[in-house]
Design a protein with these regions (language model features):
Chain A
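Sec/Tat signal peptide C-region and signal peptidase I cleavage site
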Residues: 16-22
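Early extracytoplasmic/lumenal segment of secretory-pathway proteins
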Residues: 23-89
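Extracytoplasmic ligand-binding site segments that recognize negatively charged/polar headgroups
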Residues: 32-37, 75-76, 80-212
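A ligand-binding cleft/hinge motif common to bilobed small-molecule-binding domains
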Residues: 84-90, 212, 217-235
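Periplasmic-binding protein-like
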Residues: 105-108, 123-125, 185-193, 230-256, ...
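A bilobed periplasmic-binding-protein/Venus flytrap-type ligand-binding module shared by bacterial periplasmic
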Residues: 126-133, 169-173, 247-261, 266, ...
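Mature extracytoplasmic/periplasmic domains
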Residues: 253-313
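Extracellular/periplasmic bilobal clamshell ligand-binding domains
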Residues: 296-336
């Protein structure tokens, strides 16, 4: 009897040691359908390949990243952040330098690669419209800002980020190649003209709810959320005229205890296969240049990188530099 | 019967006083917890507000010197005040009814009220969004009945925030009020009626003054909780009637400007503590009883 207990204890101890040995890491993103796809397309394959468990956490919170790094207690190993934040945070010393001996950057879209970050996926702010709810859908940003021709509420992204300011300037007649440096006075003046008709969305899920219920029958949306909404049977019309692109980035907060696993995860997530699978699931464009050939041709046509004709690339470096200044002004304007 | 109840009450009171006078030690675990996990972090936040980005009071100057931020402060008090008043007006009759209902029924109603408190806050707030929006159930019904021809703006504004927050705050008014009203001896009301008071006079001159401590306790609780509320105003309000907690979240999460965030949070804390002190001084429910 005693022996049996001893054996049980011994094997339990062994089991414990074994469990502790298997590596774990945490991936943090924005939740919702996007993170579901990241889990399915990136994390599951990664775990199968490397035996490293990936715990999902979220939503991404820049305050938390700063707190973790300053306290030296980093629980997030890889984080999906907005591109302009990645550039800024790298400069502020909040991020680990990426190990490009593990991550193959030769195949990655160079627009989104820095010492501290690589692209995660890239998306466009497009004009979305619930066709059943309005007589006619706006086709251009000027239309979206025209309350006479297109009465009713319109939806815009609430947070200070590339997208809305650019849309306002385009609507006011600024040429797409003359957007930067941003004329903030002009942009806010234009935004003033539709302010009382704006409903702000602060998450992708909310934007879908607004459009589907026709609470705001049109507005500016992430293209992938419209693809997902259309798949549920809502008659969505998407106008790609002057679609404004921005990318999310993958970063590693400084001081992570799982740096090696983090680099391997990024290498896997940005591989052609993982990127193709994520793009197929979400309607966002891959940042791996080899992912194209792995994707269904018809679906390929609906992704942001195929809509290059009148496309506007948000200038991430400009935003990184002026993020605080624009943000302070943005929120003050909203609150007025 | 009444005698035994009083004697029992006295015994309990002695035991309670004994414990309070006897050992401060019982308080220690809770106190340590509060100091480590609340007081220390708050002080650290305060330090940031005067040290970041450089030592000085510039964060407070920026906060209090800007009309935008002052508007947010005013709006915060406006919303908290309106929510408090409406909660009391709606909650008082409910509490009264609960206090005089047969126990069997009051338990059931109470269970319903408390059950709603246990449901996830976010779920409840989203539910209001679906009800109140322009294409929501309420507007559709009113339009279907021909009572209105344009949807009423019930959400993304002050109306939405007030409705959503009042609903969430109601139990915090009803529960203390019910306790106070129950403790009022019905004989006093009977006596008033016998002396010729109308039922209105019974209410305004007897019941209302006697239940004032309950109103004060409930009002303070609701007002203070409302001042720091985040989720409901963020989802049901518009940006032009932003509340302070949202401003703090913007500073901390989006702008990563902890100096300003700390300053805003600290101003809120000071105002809240001041109000609490005023309430203790003038409307202390324990003293009044």
């Amino acid at each position: 009897m005693k022996n049996k207990i001893a054996i049980a204890l011994f094997s339990a101890a062994l089991g414990f040691a074994g469990a502790a040995h298997a590596e774990d890491m945490v991936f943090t993103s924005w939740g919702g359908t996007t993170q579901d796809a990241q889990k399915a397309s990136w994390a599951e394959g990664f775990t199968a390949e490397t035996k490293i468990n990936v715990t999902q956490d979220g939503p991404t919170d820049y305050g938390k990243i700063k707190a973790m790094v300053e306290a030296g207690n980093v629980n997030w190993d890889v984080v999906d952040v907005e591109g302009d934040y990645a550039v800024q945070a790298g400069k502020l010393g909040l991020l680990e330098k990426l190990d490009f001996s593990i991550i193959d950057k030769s195949k990655l879209d160079p627009r989104f690669v820095t010492d501290y970050s690589v692209g995660s996926f890239y998306y466009s702010f497009v004009i979305g419209c619930n066709k059943d709810a309005v007589k006619q859908c706006p086709k251009s940003w000027a239309d979206v800002f025209d309350v006479k021709k297109f009465p009713g509420k319109r939806a815009f992204y609430k947070w200070s980020a590339p997208g809305v300011i650019e849309a306002a300037l385009l609507a006011d007649g600024v040429a797409a190649d003359k957007l930067y440096p941003l004329d903030l006075d002009r942009a806010f003046k234009k935004l003033d003209t539709i302010k009382s008709d704006i409903i702000w969305w602060d998450s992708g899920a909310q934007s879908q709810q607004l459009l589907a219920s026709a609470e705001a029958p049109f507005g500016s949306f992430w293209n992938g959320r419209l693809t997902a909404l259309a798949a549920t049977g809502v008659t969505v019309e998407t106008s790609w005229t002057n679609n404004i692109t921005a990318a999310d980035s993958l970063v590693v907060p400084k001081g992570t205890k799982n740096k090696d696993a983090a680099m391997k995860f990024i290498a896997h997530a940005t591989s052609d296969q993982a990127q193709a699978s994520f793009a197929t699931a979400t309607g966002y464009a891959p940042i791996n240049l080899d992912a194209n050939v792995l994707m269904d041709g018809e679906l390929r046509q609906t992704l942001p990188d195929m809509q290059a004709e009148t496309q506007v690339n948000a200038d991430m470096d400009y935003w990184a530099e002026h993020r605080d200044e624009i943000g302070t002004r943005w929120y003050a304007w909203q609150a007025q | 019967m009444a005698m035994t109840a009083t004697a029992e009450g006295m015994r309990r009171k002695r035991a309670f006083v004994g414990a309070r006078g006897g050992s401060f030690g019982y308080l220690l675990p809770a106190l340590v917890l509060v100091v480590i996990f609340f007081i220390v972090p708050v002080l650290m936040l305060l330090m940031r507000s005067v040290l970041e980005p450089e030592p000085g009071l510039q964060n407070y100057k920026a906060l209090l010197g800007s009309t935008t931020y002052l508007r947010i402060f005013l709006n915060t008090f406006l919303v908290a005040g309106v929510v408090t008043i409406i909660s009391i007006v709606i909650g008082y009759p409910v509490a009264w009814l609960l206090a005089i209902m047969p126990e069997k029924w009051s338990r059931l109603v109470l269970a319903i009220i408390i059950l709603s408190m246990w449901t996830n806050l976010l779920t409840r707030t989203y539910a209001w969004m679906v009800l109140l929006q322009r294409t929501g159930v309420i507007n559709k019904t009113l339009m279907g009945l021909g009572l209105i021809d344009q949807p009423l703006p019930l959400v993304n504004n002050l109306v939405g925030v007030t409705i959503g927050m009042t609903y969430i705050m109601l139990p915090f008014v009803i529960l203390p009020l019910m306790g106070v009203i129950r403790a009022i001896d019905p004989a006093i009301l009977r006596a008033a009626a016998l002396c010729g008071a109308t039922s209105m006079q019974c209410f305004t001159r007897v019941l209302l003054p006697l239940s004032l401590p309950g109103i004060a306790a409930g009002a303070l609780m609701v007002f203070v909780m409302s001042l720091g509320y985040f989720v409901t105003p963020a989802l049901l309000g518009g940006t032009s009637n932003m509340m302070l907690a949202e401003l703090v979240a913007q500073f901390v999460q989006s702008l990563v400007n902890w100096g300003m965030g700390g300053a805003a949070a600290f101003v809120l804390l000071v105002v809240t503590l001041t109000l609490y002190a005023v309430q203790l001084r003038y409307f202390n429910p324990n003293k009044a009883r």
